[in-house]
């Protein structure tokens, strides 16, 4: 699913060239994807919200057509946040509506804390508040669900596993986890495989995880976030339990949560109409 009205462009920020897709005019809505995705995970949202905003769906550093630094140290939260800050300013905006899923959501949480003046509204899809995730990792149930993160700490083996049998693990991640198996066409799966197969991409993508336990998300205390926030959560997420959302209101002053039953981690791809409706309602569109 590629719209001819989508424009592909690049911007250099924080010493790195980032690729993004954009459509629309007006205030900035910035979309941050997760693992193992790229800008394409927002294919059902870009045109819908381009009716109201300048939508920018970026490839995070290391992904798809964005630059892929080789050093593991390049994949830490401080660098991700500098990328986003520079992207917003480079697009000549002072602030944005920030939308993030999975890893993109983790970056969005941290960015909203670090730069609340640059985030008008925060919209988070299937990633818990960092404090809640840290709490969750102390429980046996979530530790088991997150066991893949420990596998990803190993050198080279995760890359070999991901590449084997024509990226079968990647296909299984989407189609196997999805409640609605029709949410991903074979063309969608091929798009994700092609992005992961780009030179240096797999190691870059995995390096996000290889730094995670030394990074800021798990090694700080979190205050009250003043940015108005919407969380949307697919309840059948096999990697992140719904219980990780409980108590988020202790960390976010103005919070709404919308749960979607019978929906997996890939919430905006599996239930795009409902996700779009919840975002539109939240923004008063």
Task: Please place each PLM-identified region on the residue numbering.
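Flexible "cap/lid" subdomain of the alpha/beta-hydrolase fold that forms the substrate-access gate
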Residues: 1-9, 16-18, 56, 63-99, ...
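A generic "binding-loop/recognition-motif" signal
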Residues: 16, 26, 263
């Amino acid at each position: 699913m590629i719209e001819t009205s989508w424009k592909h462009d690049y911007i250099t920020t924080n010493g790195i060239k980032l690729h993004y897709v954009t459509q629309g005019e007006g205030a900035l809505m910035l979309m941050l994807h997760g693992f193992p995705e790229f800008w394409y995970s927002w294919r059902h949202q870009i045109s819908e919200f381009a009716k109201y905003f300048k939508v920018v769906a970026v490839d995070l550093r290391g992904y798809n057509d964005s630059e892929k630094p080789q050093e593991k140290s390049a994949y830490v939260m401080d660098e991700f946040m500098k990328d986003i800050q520079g992207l917003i300013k480079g697009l000549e905006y002072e602030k944005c509506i920030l939308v993030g899923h999975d890893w993109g959501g983790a970056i969005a949480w941290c960015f909203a804390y670090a730069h609340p003046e640059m985030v008008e509204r925060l919209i988070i899809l299937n990633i818990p508040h960092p404090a809640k995730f840290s709490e969750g990792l102390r429980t046996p149930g979530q530790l088991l669900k997150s066991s893949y993160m420990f596998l990803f700490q190993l050198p080279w083996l995760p890359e070999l596993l991901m590449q084997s049998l024509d990226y079968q693990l990647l296909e299984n991640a989407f189609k196997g986890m999805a409640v609605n198996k029709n949410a991903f066409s074979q063309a969608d799966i091929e798009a994700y495989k092609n992005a992961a197969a780009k030179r240096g991409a797999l190691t870059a993508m995995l390096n996000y995880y290889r730094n995670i336990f030394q990074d800021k998300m798990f090694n700080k205390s979190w205050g009250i976030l003043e940015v108005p926030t919407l969380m949307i959560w697919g309840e059948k997420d096999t990697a992140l339990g719904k219980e990780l959302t409980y108590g988020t209101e202790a960390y976010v002053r103005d919070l709404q949560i919308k749960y979607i039953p019978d929906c997996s981690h890939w919430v905006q791809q599996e239930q795009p109409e409902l996700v779009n409706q919840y975002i539109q309602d939240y923004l008063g569109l």
